[in-house]
């Protein structure tokens, strides 16, 4: 019996699930299939045109993320229109089916894992310093500091503002 986090991290790495579209798909799809009986059939999750994964959408994604305390918008379309979503969905179905043959999949654990990956995605977004010549250097830096404060509020216990200030001081020395 393999640790669920190890399984999920392996699947994540093998399928490059680190960006908005793939993360949107897997967290919503996990919610979509948690009450289904195994084995899952990928054909059951395709739209009638076979071009998109059925059941995905921005509103649904927002609701799931909110339940996990995530208020930022990951994706307006919820991964529904992302290129590669269909292929990833099929791989995810195969992954879940294989896992289920070995042990019962705990979808609460799986969904929590993907929610944490979404948090990680937001934590890793770069800060943007604009060089707006109509503003003073101080005003431009204030915008950067506000980004750091906002990120710090979204991730309690972190010190983004202090880190940004340390980097600016070190860059000036």
Name each model feature, range by range.
Residues 2-156:
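Interfaces and regulatory segments of ATP-dependent nucleotide/adenylate/phosphodiester-chemistry enzymes
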């Amino acid at each position: 019996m393999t640790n669920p986090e190890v399984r999920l991290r392996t699947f994540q790495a093998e399928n490059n699930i680190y960006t908005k579209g793939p993360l949107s798909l897997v967290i919503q799809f996990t919610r979509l299939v948690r009450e289904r009986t195994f084995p899952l059939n990928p054909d059951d999750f395709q739209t009638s045109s076979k071009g998109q994964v059925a059941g995905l959408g921005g509103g649904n994604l927002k609701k799931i993320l909110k339940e996990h305390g995530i208020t930022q918008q990951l994706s307006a379309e919820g991964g529904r229109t992302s290129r590669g979503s269909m292929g990833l969905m099929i791989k995810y179905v195969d992954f879940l089916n294989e896992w289920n043959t070995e042990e019962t999949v705990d979808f609460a654990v799986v969904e929590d894992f993907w929610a944490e990956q979404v948090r990680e995605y937001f934590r890793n977004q770069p800060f943007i310093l604009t060089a707006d010549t109509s503003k003073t250097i101080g005003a431009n830096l204030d915008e950067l500091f506000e980004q750091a404060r906002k990120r710090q509020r979204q991730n309690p216990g972190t010190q983004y503002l202090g880190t940004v200030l340390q980097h600016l001081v070190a860059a000036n020395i």
